[in-house]
Amino acid sequence: MADAEMENKMGTENEYGADQIQILEGLEAVRKRPGMYIGSTSARGLHHLVYEIVDNAVDEALAGYCKNIEVTINPDNSITVEDDGRGIPVGMNHKAGKSALEVVYTVLHAGGKFGGGGYKVSGGLHGVGASVVNALSTKLSVEVYKDGQIYSQSYKIGKPDEPVKVIGKCSAEKHGTKVTFHPDPTIFEETVYDYDTLKQRLRETAFLTKGLRIVLSDARVDPVHTHEFHYAGGIKEFVTYLNKSKEALYPEVIYCEGTRDGVYVEVAMQHNDSYNDATYSFVNNIITPEGGTHLAGFRNALTKTFNTYARANKILK
């Protein structure tokens, strides 16, 4: 190829002008760059899909409306998450011109957790997590149990098959949301879920949400493999669990809780014979591995309390 022709071709390929700026509509951006939304397309990202849906159910529990969450790995490696919360709203969202349920599952940055009315505490974001899971699934179906009716909508690669419709009746007492999704094998490196990975995460979630019952079932095996997590003691039981292979220096877990300026705080601790620090901090049930002012404040207060006691009892000069 002549030098002039080569230079002309390279110039065209490297051209960067106004027309090279792409506009990705709807959930297209999620499929184009999934790592921006779920971290990766490896096994870690695959399991993150489950956490996104579960976190939405947990937020209902944190708001005081959900007591039970059931997570099932189906025989075809799809996932079903069902909760007994209030159920995602199904009425018409007048701004979007469609059902609120469809908005939640098809529009990024749409949900009930951006303002102060729907949720005072939340770890997930309806309309971010839910719509991302939908975008990265070949199929997703959602059922909402509300006001004695069962509402349903199904999607393929993030797009609704038809508008939200009523598919049946349920008891007036039944309420909640049931979601089933099939991860897209063209997006993820693997689509086989690891039971132990989900078990570890769901156990931790149950510890952090006092009184919440979470059931994990693996329907890929016969008989179905099931674990139930329910901890009335919450993070007190979490500390006991973390210390089970160590020798505690005193029998009772120290626990305190309180609210100041509208912020609720729980602390549980129990020293053991290890020299390694094992302090875990969470905000709205989401672990904060890098710490933050909440952890720094706790450590400062703990140090100050120990020093004050030690000086008062002439242990520390």
Question: What do these predicted ranges mean?
Answer:
Residues 2-19, 77-100, 111-241:
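GHKL-type ATPase core
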Residues 2-54, 103-105:
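Bergerat-fold GHKL ATPase/HATPase_c domain
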Residues 23-31, 74-75, 170-180, 269-283:
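Flexible hinge/switch segments at interdomain interfaces of large molecular machines
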Residues 37-44, 89-95, 188, 287-290:
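Flexible beta-alpha connector loops of hexameric P-loop NTPases
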Residues 38-40, 118-120, 125, 279-289:
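Short, conserved non-catalytic motifs in the polymerase core
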Residues 44-67, 129-136:
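Conserved ATP-binding N-box helix of the HATPase_c
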Residues 67-73:
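A conserved short beta-strand within the histidine kinase catalytic ATPase domain
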Residues 163-166, 196, 203-205, 211, ...:
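GHKL/Histidine-kinase-like ATPase module
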